[in-house]
Amino acid sequence: MAGLSGAQIPDGEFTAVVYRLIRNARYAEAVQLLGGELQRSPRSRAGLSLLGYCYYRLQEFALAAECYEQLGQLHPELEQYRLYQAQALYKACLYAEATRVAFLLLDNPAYHSRVLRLQAAIKYSEGDLPGSRSLVEQLPSREGGEESGGENETDGQINLGCLLYKEGQYEAACSKFFAALQASGYQPDLSYNLALAYYSSRQYASALKHIAEIIERGIRQHPELGVGMTTEGIDVRSVGNTLVLHQTALVEAFNLKAAIEYQLRNYEAAQEALTDMPPRAEEELDPVTLHNQALMNMDARPTEGFEKLQFLLQQNPFPPETFGNLLLLYCKYEYFDLAADVLAENAHLIYKFLTPYLYDFLDAVITCQTAPEEAFIKLDGLAGMLTEVLRKLTIQVQEARHNRDDEAIKKAVNEYDETMEKYIPVLMAQAKIYWNLENYPMVEKIFRKSVEFCNDHDVWKLNVAHVLFMQENKYKEAIGFYEPIVKKHYDNILNVSAIVLANLCVSYIMTSQNEEAEELMRKIEKEEEQLSYDDPDKKMYHLCIVNLVIGTLYCAKGNYDFGISRVIKSLEPYNKKLGTDTWYYAKRCFLSLLENMSKHTIMLRDSVIQECVQFLEHCELHGRNIPAVIEQPLEEERMHVGKNTVTYESRQLKALIYEIIGWNI
């Protein structure tokens, strides 16, 4: 049947062939045949009706609406085509046009109930929740005789559940969806609604349970969808955006699973959830999947991530989180001018997609670049408002515990956690203003003011440790904050940031706790050896960075003989230890060494100089494909490919050594 044209079909068989294609869900082929037939008979009711149906099944809703519009004009007495046109326009997110067409059917009692449902759905999608609720509440009394009472009641539960969800009443929404699921039996889309409501109420375990059921049933009933194939590295064809895929709710389930894992900071599991979903070509991806791919691969592929988010912002509709996430990522990567431009160009989106908190936060962060004092005042106002909320919620939690009211405790604790998630970024933005000025005592002062709320928060503890470390006379206090972080992950120590381990080792050394430093380094070495045994080709940088930071410390103290030697040994073997980050630390020490040599403030033995030259030659050999600098993702002027390598920079450093010591190259 593949590639069959109208001319090849025997006389009298055309209709049978088209219906066979539709029965087998081969809608694209049916569209080809029908398109050719309609060129010969453009007013064919059967042809237009089947073409509209096929377009609808292919989710080409705008094209389906055009077919039904033509049918409505050709056969105005058949109002069902207006209803189909309105439904297709709604699916195409053309809400104003859908409302206009649906309004024409309101006076027909046969369609009244379905039109009310459609109007309620349109208002829901437009964000008019009171209008949608008003229409939903009319439905039960209007539907008498059209459907069985059980189905009618289930639909009512689902509709109210959706409204409650949009209104932020997630627990109540869960109850409605759960009741509907019990009444109707398993339905993938309804099970997904329940999982989404659980997710929004932070009941991740319950959400994952329903997601697992959707995935298991999808795999069992439709193995042809290729779930998990991409993750396993199997090259598979796109399954397309078929009706079957839509009915399984697999795409929605995997996206929600990715979001939960991302929230729980299980970033690898989040990425795996996205690759586990049925394979589709990039141009076939839905907006939510595209948004999540951009977000979860941002660290590895930031340029691609920005392109996807910018593309989504031009679509209608786009995931509501897109606008805020793009602005936050611009600020994270310090593209403050771009963030300001996007805000200015999309002023109409601010009220709809940014909460007052997020807008005020972004405004303050962008202001930091030109008026840090003004920005600090804005952030201080925001912090003051949030601390007031935190105090009130603390009292509510205490009162609820006193009254043994579990529901009130749960509600207050959830609100407290949500407020804390807003407060921490504001606090860090305030601290960053003084951090950039290297005014570390002021940063410490800001953190001390927040100890009442943040003393158990990992991000706060980590940054307190960093600011104490940077003051150079508070290593003992820094240990008090670094140690709990490291001990928390001691069994999987490579999950701890290398710089945290390095700073803790330096703090131990600076407080004469050399045994503790050595023990920690042995632990890291043992973990890396085990990992190397399991995956011999994997590069590991933790111990290398620890040694580099220790070497840097000795260089900073003027002990270049020992410091440079430590730096050189830390990068052996070069094929596993040399990378962009490790080269960054190493070259800083060499540049400091060369600066002091050129000023004649230090003298090095010939053997040390020879060791330096040999080291740079090794880096030259192994660094051909290693970038010396990771370029910013949106830079207009890209660095020269040949110059942005460890090889090129190591040659430059070697040439400088020869020039300073007067050797001939």
Swiss-Prot record:
GO BP annotation list: cilium assembly; intraciliary anterograde transport; intraciliary transport
Main location: other
Cellular-component GO terms for this entry: axonemal microtubule; ciliary tip; cilium; intraciliary transport particle B
Region Disordered, residue ranges: 130-154
Keyword annotations: Cell projection, Cilium, Cilium biogenesis/degradation, Coiled coil, Repeat, TPR repeat
Location within or outside the cell: Cell projection, Cilium
TPR repeats: 11-44, 45-78, 154-187, 189-221, 393-424, 425-457, 459-492, 544-577
One annotated GO molecular function: intraciliary transport particle B binding
Keyword Cell division: no
The family this protein is said to belong to: Belongs to the TTC30/dfy-1/fleer family.
Summary of the function given for this chain in its UniProt record: Required for polyglutamylation of axonemal tubulin. Plays a role in anterograde intraflagellar transport (IFT), the process by which cilia precursors are transported from the base of the cilium to the site of their incorporation at the tip.
Protein name according to UniProt: Intraflagellar transport protein 70B
